[in-house]
Amino acid sequence: SGDVTMTVTGDDGREQTQVFPLSVMAGQLSPGQHEFSVAAGIPDDDSDLEGGVFAASYGYGLDGLTLRTGGVFNQDWQGASAGAVLGLGYLGALSADGAYATAKYRDGSRSGNKVKLAWSKQLALTNTGLRVSWSHQSEEYEDMSSFNPAETWLQQNQGRRTRDEWNAGISQPVGGLFSLSASGWQRSYYPASTTGSYRYADDNGKETGVTGTLSTQIKSVSLSLGWSGSRNMNGENTWSASASVSVPFTLFERKYSSSTTVSTGKDGGTGVSTGLSGALNDRFSYGLGGGRDSDGGVSSYLNA
């Protein structure tokens, strides 16, 4: 989606993920309530960005309406967004977001935009969650996660860029024992670029996919099983599956949380990652970990 995701660890050692800010923000604020977030960090080993990243967002609640704005800044990539969440009462909630980003390539800067509309509804009788979303982005919009400032724009544009994406999902708790969720998506692309002026006329196909998750919590231990499958424009299928466990614990009167994920896919490889997070005080938290992906690549991270 192009969002910048940062993990914040609370005093109890549990992790909370915050997204800054280029996505639909579904949470509504009470009238007169303010929400302000600031974060700074260093890109991980999988990123081609250099230098630090600073992110900030602000939200304000009105009667039935939440307004939000935010920005993410790096020396080579800057993005800003604004959005609103409107409560529709019995009909659920509707959100609209827009984002604008500028990426500085080796041969100059390019700017683009994206918009996203989303609807969600929680059925009170069964506690079933429903959601539908649509997003569109211009061809020159560049996600921070895929941006490489060492390349030219043409080099980055050799592959297909997302044009439109539809998502639909449903979630359902079952008897207080576990929760099930399923979603499907369809994505269309701009034609792939081969030179500055020539494009394959038929390289504008669609891809589709589905995902499913089963999650539960046994006392303080969280367990999750996931599966996903997709089909590309050439009719080729792929799939992946994962299992994860998160265990909070206390050591020397400090609270921590450990997490481990095992994943596999169509090609048969197995990936394993593990991490540990904690907090020294109300203002300072940290996380560290590492692992091996299904292709044998090794990675590690450290954040604070």
Label for each model-derived stretch:
Residues 62-64:
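Glycine- and small/acidic-residue-enriched microsegments that form turns, hinges, and capping elements
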Residues 53-55:
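Edge strands and adjacent loops of beta-rich recognition modules
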